[in-house]
């Protein structure tokens, strides 16, 4: 059997297995809150769900490519984004225990009004929209060249099959399959790393000496990731939805564990790129390493991409349906929730037919929402409602500045790739905090 046939078999068989294993949601609590027999997910289940739902196909592709470009420094830099879990876990714990808020939307509506909640909802809807195409494009790339018939066919089939089991159980299906996918991911990653370390010309010494710890060669991205971690998690409903389905203590514990374990997973996956670097490979690190080791490892890498992309997709579908049905109260029954899943699946697939860079779904959207930093970091600070709008608009402006590459070089104090990303975020987040707090003192003076 040819490799391409094995790849199709992996997609079809794994999706069908998940469909038949997924629980059928019959109540709103099961579909939108993953409550089964009045029991919420425990620490182990929630931690696994958090990690795998954030180990996107695009994120592990980026991790491997950064390992290829910058050595282990690139992997560590990208793992910086996983500080997001710790930040969200601690702040949402405080919001739930001290503020008694039951959702992010309730917090925003109570403190800043319905207008702020509407703007926030638009931001996270765009985020969910991005998640669909940016992950399915990675899957398509394993089946054919971008724009080819096999490429499009793989994307459409994969999206439909994932939608099928997501529609069946909603968030219950998502979290249930997350556990299976996390176990699969761990086993497959160990197989890949075991194969790499079994070669005679690669060792841990090669990993340690593979990069240079300088701003120009990876640290720009690392510090940008750390800065964005104080706003990034709050515009990701896949993450925040899971912060309100268990007790505050279980949630905090799970998020802190996910922060550490998720970062380790990303760094380990970047080792694939480090190996590619030592062998002088070019192009997509994961694909090239798979080809170098033969059909079996290529299929293992392909399967790990399918696993991570499916996890992200089903989480995206369930979060979008919850956004419309629960947070925005646009529909009450499960039928509405299932229809909304189909809508985001269709809309999110349309950009596949356009030429869009995968990485842009992470870095640019991350910059555009830095205005959320003071909103959540200073969640208990009394400020007028205008503070929310000023900070969010300020963040969007800096995001646009980054997109068009018009940020003054005189305000960048490091060089190399991602220098603009770092310094736009540094100056942007300082501006957002200042502009968020200023109205507080103006109102007091009056």
Regions found by a protein language model. Give the residues of each.
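Selective recognition of specific alpha-helical transmembrane segments in multi-pass small-molecule
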Residues: 12, 122-133, 184-194, 221-233, ...
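Hydrophobic alpha-helical segments and their helix-loop junctions in multi-pass secondary transporters
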Residues: 17-27, 128-132, 136, 140, ...
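Membrane-interface helix-loop-helix modules in multi-pass membrane proteins
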Residues: 35-100, 227, 239, 244-280, ...
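Hydrophobic, small-residue-rich membrane helices and short re-entrant helix-turn-helix hairpins
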Residues: 101-109, 169-178, 234-264, 281-287, ...
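Helix-loop-helix module between adjacent transmembrane segments
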Residues: 76-166, 228, 305-315, 331-334
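A generic transmembrane alpha-helix motif of multi-pass inner-membrane proteins
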Residues: 1-23, 388-446
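Membrane-interface "cap" regions at the ends of multi-pass membrane proteins
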Residues: 1-60, 166-172, 182, 188, ...
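Loop-to-transmembrane helix boundary motifs in multi-pass membrane proteins
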Residues: 114-118, 322-360, 365-366
């Amino acid at each position: 059997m040819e490799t391409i046939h094995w790849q199709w078999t992996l997609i079809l068989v794994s999706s069908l297995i998940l469909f038949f294993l997924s629980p059928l949601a019959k109540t709103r609590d099961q579909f939108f809150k993953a409550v089964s027999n009045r029991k919420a997910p425990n620490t182990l289940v929630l931690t696994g769900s958090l990690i795998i739902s954030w180990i996107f196909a695009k994120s592990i592709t980026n991790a491997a490519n950064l390992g290829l470009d910058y050595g282990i420094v690139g992997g560590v830099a990208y793992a910086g984004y996983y500080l997001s879990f710790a930040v969200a876990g601690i702040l949402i714990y405080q919001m739930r225990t001290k503020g008694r808020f039951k959702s992010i939307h309730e917090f925003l509506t109570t403190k800043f009004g319905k207008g702020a909640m509407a703007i926030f909802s638009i931001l996270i809807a765009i985020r969910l929209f991005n998640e669909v195409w940016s992950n399915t494009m990675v899957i398509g790339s394993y089946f054919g060249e971008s724009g080819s018939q096999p490429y499009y066919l793989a994307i459409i089939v994969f999206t439909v099959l994932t939608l099928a089991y997501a529609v069946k159980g909603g968030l219950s299906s998502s979290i249930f399959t997350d556990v299976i996918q996390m176990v699969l991911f761990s086993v497959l990653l160990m197989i890949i790393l075991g194969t790499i370390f079994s070669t005679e010309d690669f060792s841990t010494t090669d990993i340690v000496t593979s990069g240079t710890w300088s701003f120009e060669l990876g640290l720009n991205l690392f510090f940008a990731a750390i800065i964005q971690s104080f706003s990034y998690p709050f515009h990701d409903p896949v993450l925040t939805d899971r912060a309100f389905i268990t007790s505050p203590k279980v949630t905090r514990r799970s998020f802190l564990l996910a922060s550490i374990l998720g970062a380790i997973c990303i760094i380990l996956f970047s080792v694939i790129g480090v190996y590619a670097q030592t062998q002088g490979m070019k192009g997509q690190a994961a694909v090239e390493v798979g080809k170098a080791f033969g059909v079996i490892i290529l299929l293992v890498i392909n399967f790990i991409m399918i696993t991570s992309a499916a996890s992200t997709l089903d989480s995206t579908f369930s979060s979008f349906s919850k956004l419309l049905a629960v947070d925005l109260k646009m529909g009450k029954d499960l039928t509405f929730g299932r229809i909304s899943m189909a809508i985001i699946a269709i809309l999110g697939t349309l950009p596949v037919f356009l030429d869009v860079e995968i990485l842009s779904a992470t870095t640019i959207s991350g910059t555009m929402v830095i205005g959320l930093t003071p909103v959540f970091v200073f969640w208990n600070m009394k400020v007028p409602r205008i503070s929310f709008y000023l900070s969010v608009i300020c963040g969007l402006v800096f995001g646009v500045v980054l997109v068009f590459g018009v940020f003054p070089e005189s305000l960048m104090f490091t060089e190399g790739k991602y220098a603009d990303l770092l310094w736009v975020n540094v100056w942007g987040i300082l501006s957002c905090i200042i502009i968020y707090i200023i109205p507080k003192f103006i109102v007091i003076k009056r």
